[in-house]
């Protein structure tokens, strides 16, 4: 490990983190944690809660205290009956192993066996009361995902040990789903969810602990009411101009004045063939890297990110693309940026959409991890490199804001004479429809995703506070923005609420925070590229620590 504990307390925190999330330890570079899963039986979870409390009382820094608060809050969610957590951990562990090392039968066999043990432990010691319908839906979705993983493993391996372990895992998943999921769940999409909610309701049952989760799981300072108000303020600020933008593009394209119709029309007209997507991204990043490093955020000289086509067996988990940080606790960190081309997932692969994906995933998430792991523009502690839900929120905020930073740069570039690197970039884009059209479409997609992320804030607050149920919120969002009910559902609920109350808000809330402090730094004479390099090198501290460090930099 390149990051070492500076005290016995920090060493104890590292040990606790490894026990709670062995898969994260493995992908962080600790090979001895391959094939391991945490044990979520209730007596063990309760003992972990006590251990976290004891360590918190001895914590030496705010980073340590808030990390422990986030870890403790996640354990409490499992104790509150959020039954989607064990299968979610298992899915994350499987795709982490598959992305990092491919089909290593011994590790995957161990992981399948550990998954069986984890699911049975939670089922036998967990909540006796029936989970709320919303939690049962989230659990069924994750169980369906695990069954898809199992099906892939059976097809991809010849190992009899792995096949046997997978068969046992399938039985355990089915038993778990029968106890904690929705009876007869088919995982067939939005229409099925509407039917379930109309029949059984869609309550998540989180109103009694939502405020606590905001404060501890994600280190928010806002109350649920304040969070909703912030989301509405963002939406009210930008939705009118976005609607005008949709009208103009729809008129130009000769299609219905709806954002999704515009998006699908662009995609249909300009989507790259699957065989060209990775090549386009690799060519694109050669130019974008130079522009980003010069104008937005510096890239450390040992930055390594591999661009790959999402394997078909992972495309269900990454329907458009994604990023993963690997060996981030070692001296040789690297990242993987995946682009999905599997036609079953109908990925959007127009040049502008792929540019947006590249900016968000690679020059947001991947660069944040790499610059932090290399201590490039700042020196994070070991505690601040241990990923948690609170720390991951920081990465979401950085990546969300990076999209609009790149948009601002493109608009500024159009107002002056292009540099040599910019001319090369424009020449490259000429092969894919030309810079003018791609810039216009990048603007549209960036603004579309901003609307989605603002809606996530409002939805997160209302649904988890029981102010609106899921279907009521979807109906409201459809009327307010014109986005389809299906899109609102998919962008607000299955992945984001499954990650816990508060996660859906992280993109916009943390992104707005970065933007606000950045403006203060610029007013005080700091350069944007220096501010962003510092912010992008701070590791994964909880929000309050991250913001405090940024404000100190901005005013110093």
Which positions does each model-derived feature cover?
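N-terminal maturation segment of proteins
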Residues: 1-556
């Amino acid at each position: 490990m390149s990051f070492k504990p500076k005290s016995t307390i920090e060493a104890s925190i590292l040990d606790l983190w490894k026990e709670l999330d062995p898969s994260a330890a493995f992908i962080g570079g600790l090979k001895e944690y391959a094939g391991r899963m945490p044990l979520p039986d209730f007596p063990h979870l309760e003992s972990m809660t006590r251990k976290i409390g004891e360590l918190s009382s001895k914590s030496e820094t705010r980073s340590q205290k808030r990390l422990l608060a986030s870890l403790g809050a996640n354990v409490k969610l499992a104790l509150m009956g959020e039954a989607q957590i064990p299968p979610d951990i298992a899915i994350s562990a499987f795709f982490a192993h598959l992305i990092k090392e491919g089909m290593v039968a011994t590790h995957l066999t161990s992981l399948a066996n550990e998954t069986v043990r984890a699911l049975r432990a939670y089922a036998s010691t967990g909540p006796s009361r029936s989970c709320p319908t919303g939690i049962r839906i989230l659990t069924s979705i994750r169980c369906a995902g695990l069954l898809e993983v199992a099906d892939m493993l059976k097809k991809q391996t010849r190992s009899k040990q792995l096949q046997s372990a997978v068969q046992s895992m399938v039985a355990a998943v089915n038993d778990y789903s029968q106890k904690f999921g929705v009876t007869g769940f088919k995982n067939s999409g939005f229409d099925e969810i509407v039917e379930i909610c109309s029949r059984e309701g869609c309550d998540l049952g989180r109103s009694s602990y939502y405020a606590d989760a905001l404060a501890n799981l994600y280190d928010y300072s806002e109350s649920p009411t304040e969070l909703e108000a912030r989301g509405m303020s963002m939406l009210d600020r930008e939705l009118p101009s976005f609607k005008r933008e949709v009208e103009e593009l729809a008129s130009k394209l000769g299609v219905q004045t709806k954002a999704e119709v515009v998006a699908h029309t662009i995609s249909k007209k300009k989507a790259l063939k699957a065989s060209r997507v990775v090549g386009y991204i690799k060519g694109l990043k050669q130019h974008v890297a130079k522009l980003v490093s010069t104008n937005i955020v510096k890239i450390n000289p040992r930055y390594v990110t591999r661009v790959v086509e999402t394997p078909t067996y992972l495309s269900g988990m990454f329907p458009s693309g994604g990023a993963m940080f690997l060996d981030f606790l070692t001296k040789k960190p690297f990242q993987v940026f995946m682009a999905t081309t599997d036609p079953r997932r109908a990925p959007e692969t127009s040049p502008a959409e792929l540019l947006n994906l590249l900016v968000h995933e690679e020059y947001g998430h991947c660069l944040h991890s790499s610059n932090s792991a290399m201590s490039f523009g700042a020196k994070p502690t070991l505690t601040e490199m241990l990923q948690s839900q609170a720390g991951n929120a920081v990465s979401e905020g950085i990546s969300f804001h990076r999209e609009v930073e790149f948009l601002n740069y493109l608009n500024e570039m159009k107002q002056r004479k292009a540099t040599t690197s910019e001319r090369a970039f424009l020449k490259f884009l000429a092969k894919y429809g030309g810079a003018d059209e791609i810039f216009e479409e990048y603007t549209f997609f960036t603004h579309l995703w901003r609307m989605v992320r603002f809606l996530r804030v409002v939805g997160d607050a209302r649904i988890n506070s029981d102010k609106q149920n899921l279907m009521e919120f979807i109906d409201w969002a459809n009327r307010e923005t014109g986005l389809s009910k299906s899109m609102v559902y998919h962008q607000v609920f299955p992945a984001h609420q499954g990650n816990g109350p508060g996660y859906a808000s992280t993109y916009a809330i943390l992104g707005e925070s970065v933007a606000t402090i950045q403006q203060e730094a610029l007013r005080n004479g700091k350069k944007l590229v220096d501010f962003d390099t510092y912010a992008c090198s701070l590791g994964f501290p909880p929000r309050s620590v991250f913001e405090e460090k940024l404000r100190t930099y901005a005013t110093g």
